Regions:
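Short, charged/polar "capping" segments at the starts of alpha-helices
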Residues: 7-12, 83-84
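Charged/polar, solvent-exposed surface patches and flexible loops
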Residues: 12-15, 19, 90, 97
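Short, conserved loop/helix-junction motifs that constitute active-site signature segments
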Residues: 65-70
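Helix-adjacent hinge/juxtasegments
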Residues: 14-53, 58
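Conserved RecA-like ASCE P-loop NTPase motor core of nucleic-acid helicases/translocases
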Residues: 1-6
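Short glycine-rich anion-binding loops that position phosphate/pyrophosphate groups of nucleotides
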Residues: 60-62
């Protein structure tokens, strides 16, 4: 599930996923179609109706109740936007407070570097 409250972002993701990779495409659909439950990747703003094992949160989207049980929950945000950084920190605190494992990754010099990690409470 790719979740964004921004309709323009959802439309851009939809268009991009039809075009890449060059030798194919990533099967997906926009939320609200007749086959939402069958989509390998569902793009929308609501809950995952496609048995998603992971949720990608974009543009300040919030996790929904029960999504802490997902295999993975990604929060993508602009590290140069203080409001987005503060919101991501709040999500980190809430999610780790629920006992979820968490990792913070930052893009540096064209590669991803893990900055910190919180293991689940045992």
């Amino acid at each position: 599930m790719l979740r964004s409250p921004n309709p323009d972002r959802r439309d851009r993701l939809d268009a991009k996923l039809w075009l890449e990779p060059e030798d194919g495409f990533l099967p997906h659909g926009l939320e609200g179609g007749p086959f939402d439950a069958d989509q390998p990747v569902l793009i929308g703003q609501g809950g995952a109706t496609n048995a998603a094992q992971g949720v990608v949160l974009l543009d300040g989207a919030e996790p929904l109740p029960g999504e802490e049980a997902c295999e993975r929950l990604w929060v993508l945000f602009d590290g140069d936007d203080p409001v987005a950084v503060q919101a991501a920190r709040g999500l980190w605190t809430r999610m780790t407070g629920l006992g979820m494992a968490a990792q913070y990754w930052s893009e540096e010099t064209r590669r991803w570097v893990m900055k910190t990690e919180k293991k689940p409470a045992e």
